[in-house]
């Protein structure tokens, strides 16, 4: 079997969760006998595994069906996740939902990162097979390492005794950044570090003010 992994605007989404999913999916499939291509011009594949939602993604799905190919959609996004993310996102969220549903309906099967996401998609009246499969992480990259711990503490000028709380994500409310800051203020005895970045011109004012310390 041959699978076409398609990611629209790879450079634009490279640092996002969706962008990193490409490498993880390629690595996961490397352990199987499945042949993988990322060439959108390929025509000899059996399954289109699509991860993005732009106009070109819509075109790829339609082309796949015309050629009699099967389509697996990776449901990274939902209406609920889109709301309260970017400035103005709530205004266009209903239209985004309609567009998402129109794409997901064209899939022969859908993969979601969590059972919760599967539940949300079922609420959109999608009847296809939906499989919740974690995006996963490369375990070897996050294995315990005294050397890395020392470098981390040296970089942030932390003593060996200091307790550190870490979170990773974009500056989105749904990522828990408001709760993270509230918790940090309540517990000054600990060091709180948030890893991640989003252009502050794109996020709601309450998030922007929070990051700027206003």
Question: Where are the regions a protein language model picked out?
Answer:
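Acidic anion/phosphate-binding donor-loop and adjacent secondary structure
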Residues: 122, 137-154
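Membrane-proximal helix-turn-helix segments that form the acceptor-binding/catalytic region
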Residues: 66, 92-110
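Glycosyltransferase donor-sugar binding loop
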Residues: 137, 191-213
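Conserved donor-binding/catalytic core segment of Leloir-type glycosyltransferases
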Residues: 159-175, 181-187, 193
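Short donor-sugar binding/catalytic loops of nucleotide-sugar-dependent glycosyltransferases
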Residues: 9-10, 168-172, 198-199
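Acceptor-binding helix/loop patch of EC 2.4 sugar-transfer enzymes
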Residues: 8, 12, 73-98, 140-141, ...
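Carbohydrate-associated surface elements
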Residues: 116, 136
